[in-house]
Amino acid sequence: MSARPLCADLSRTGEEPLAATASRVDTWLLVEYRGLWGHEAAATSTLSPEVKAHLRALGAAPPRSRVLFVRRTERRSSPTIAVFLARSTEGATSVRRLELDGYDDLLAVDLETVGEPVGHPVLLVCTHGKHDRCCAKFGRPLYEALRNVVDEEWVWQSTHVGGDRFAGNVVSLPHGLYYGRVDPAAALTLVESVLESRVLLENYRGRSCYSMPVQAAERAVREATGALGIEGVRLISTRGDSARWLVVFAAAGVAWEVEVRCGEGELTHLTCDANELRRPRCYVAGTPRERAV
């Protein structure tokens, strides 16, 4: 019996849209962990029960938070553990870094007040192969390609960021920009867009500070106006229910209203290990309309 195709290959050949697929995250806690990453990386790690419970609590804390393990090849023998705290809220982005002597130190430090500001972007490449085969197959070559075109301090392997079938996946912090289906050959193009503080629409999944319906509207406004600067599009308002939304963005000195509706994609395997075919939820944006502010 032939092996099932990879979920990322199915998504790509089926031309599943990338737009409006970014996870909703405002606060990121990145913890360097050089041990094996199991399917549930933190749960299967060698961290103490107290540290595991602490990380679970941090991941559940408001605002919308996510805890990821990260690593870099050249830091395998480092005597300290790198920890990052990033904020991705619109208009208030930041990244801070601190070095700890051990994981138990996480229990004692106030992550809200410690750490040094990071003056460069942090690129997370999902290489979490135990979570999904596609993350390793497409993520690891992409990680190596990015390390070859930018300071290696900028690029980290990470555990699951969401959307395995869109691998290779990159999250650009502090802005929380999700990119998918990034090939190694496009590494330099992606880095150039990051350095120029603009969105690379070809691979853009969305911005983590927005819900998925708002992500769909943001992309529609960027496509209609050509406004690619990260801060060149600003959310004004959103209202709606579980099936229809009206979202207003400001861009190019104009307010734009976008109607977004919820739909379903084609039947597919959402992950490599999924046994059942499912229809992914999708968000379809109408044509942006100018409106009075």
Please state what every model-predicted region is.
Residues 1-293:
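Histidine/cysteine-enriched polar flanking segments
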